[in-house]
Regions:
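Class I S-adenosyl-L-methionine-dependent methyltransferase catalytic core
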Residues: 1-112
């Protein structure tokens, strides 16, 4: 993964594909909602449903909402999956915030 700026490390295409396939293998692929909280250049989006909700503060691909995912207010859904590669920040501070935000509306989280 190449570091760019703003604590961004872009996920390589093959790694994103593997993560999605492994998540589906373990948890299934039938979701009412899929969320990519730190979509960046869209690596995961290539392997997720078209209606995936994708967020990033500095998106670099089409279909990604410009927003800080930690501030997005989403209703809870039982069959909701959050999947992606969020920024870690110093001492994993950001990744913990992404997990906490995800737990407010989703029961299933698959982050690397």
């Amino acid at each position: 993964m190449a570091k760019i700026a703003h604590d961004k490390y872009y996920t390589e295409d093959q790694l994103a594909k593997y993560c999605v396939e492994k998540t589906y293998e373990i948890l299934g692929s039938d979701w009412d909602r899929v969320i990519e909280p730190s979509a960046g250049a869209g690596a995961y989006l290539k392997y997720l449903p078209e209606d995936t909700l994708a967020y990033d503060i500095l998106p670099e691909a089409d279909g990604i909402v410009v927003a800080d995912y930690r501030q997005v207010q989403l209703p809870y859904m039982e069959r909701s999956l959050v999947i992606g590669n969020p920024p870690f920040g110093r001492a994993n501070k950001l990744s913990v915030q992404f997990v906490k935000a995800s737990l407010l509306h989703s029961d299933y989280i698959s982050l690397i």
